[in-house]
């Protein structure tokens, strides 16, 4: 998210939580509140998608956009990857809801509002799952009463 001088952004971090600010990674050693008073681009740790979680087209697009925020040295490369992926998605997706969201994402990124683009992409995850026929994972219960997917 980008903070500007007109409105300060207040953030609360838990002990051990990380935040990415202008490409730097900060970790709180205890519960802390921060106030960003000037222009800063940041991403909270719970919004950072890990490479192994890029299992759908929208998650892959999110990852490319995310890299523009948290790896400034790779911004140009990530931007090119993002643009290529977005172009492919316009050719692939036929759903009006997702296509409209992708148009907004394209505009947001073009205007330097990458954090807002990330929020827009995340909001489309349920629709993408619906279109892909994804079902929530439900582990069968064994005779012992434990979920088969649970750790022993």
From Swiss-Prot:
From the Swiss-Prot or TrEMBL record, what is one GO molecular function term?
Answer: mRNA 5'-UTR binding
InterPro entries listed in its UniProt record? Flagellum_FlbT
| Name of the protein in question | Probable flagellum biosynthesis repressor protein FlbT
Question: What task does this protein carry out?
Answer: Has a post-transcriptional repressor function in flagellum biogenesis. Associates with the 5'-UTR of fljK mRNA and promotes its degradation.
Q: Show the NCBIfam families listed in the entry.
A: PRK00794.1-1
**HAMAP family to which the protein is assigned, alphabetical:** FlbT
Which keywords accompany this UniProt record?
Answer: Bacterial flagellum biogenesis, Repressor, RNA-binding
Q: Which family does it belong to?
A: Belongs to the FlbT family.
Which terms does the UniProt entry file under GO BP?
bacterial-type flagellum organization; mRNA catabolic process; negative regulation of bacterial-type flagellum assembly
Q: List the disulfide bonds.
A: none
Classify the source by domain of life: Bacteria
Gene it is expressed from: flbT
């Amino acid at each position: 998210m980008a903070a500007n001088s007109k409105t300060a952004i207040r953030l609360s971090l838990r002990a051990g939580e990380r935040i990415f600010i202008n490409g730097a990674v900060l970790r709180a050693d205890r519960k802390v509140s921060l106030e960003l008073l000037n222009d800063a681009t940041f991403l909270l740790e719970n919004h950072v998608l890990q490479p192994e979680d890029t299992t759908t087209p929208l998650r892959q697009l999110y990852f490319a956009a995310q890299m523009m925020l948290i790896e400034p040295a790779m911004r140009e490369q990530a931007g090119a990857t993002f643009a290529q992926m977005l172009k492919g998605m316009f050719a692939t997706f036929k759903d009006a809801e997702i296509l409209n969201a992708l148009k907004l994402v394209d505009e947001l990124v073009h205007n330097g509002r990458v954090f807002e683009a990330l929020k827009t992409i995340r909001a489309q995850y349920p629709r993408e799952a619906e279109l892909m026929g994804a079902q929530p994972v439900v582990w069968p219960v064994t005779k012992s009463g434990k979920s088969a997917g649970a750790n022993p």
